[in-house]
Amino acid sequence: MTFLKISLTLLAVFYISISTGFARDFASMDPALTAAKLQGSGRLTWWGFHIYDASFYRSGNLSSSEFALDMRYHKSFTGISIANRSAEEMKRIGVSDIQAALWGRELASFLPDVESGQTLTAIYVPKQGTTFYYEGKRIALIPGADFSKAFFGIWFDPKTSAPKLRAELLGQSCPPPLFNEAC
């Protein structure tokens, strides 16, 4: 019986340390996300390679407009390659070549190189835009709903190149109001 109690206690401590280790403190990044809750998470793989794990957080209730997308990378990438891929994905969902190239250059101007285990987080707040964080530190703000819709559309637009990841992130819920998509 004592062995069972010790085992259960160790298991509980392990579970708590794991779950709090992956929790994000969005309130310290943006006060609009004080009550952010995980809505869904998933893994992006490409040709069998684990690229990153993504987690989608919503503020308060599901009709709230504020949200965050947190990505923990499992491969190393240059900031320029992340920016270029983002621009390509924006074109895939219908952004013009010219606009995607402009936004790609803007992303390339601040996105850092990432190593395995590091995080990039993007937070959307209406009338403010998208704020980017690297390892929890603010690195840039791109104002405007047009950019935000294009950037987050990489994951949430129905034409995404990663429909399985989209479904995992959204869970049983609708996309954020930014997308005006009927459920």
Outline where the language-model segments fall.
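Positively charged n-region of N-terminal signal peptides that target proteins for export
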Residues: 1-6
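Terminal leader/tail segments of proteins
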Residues: 22-134, 138-183
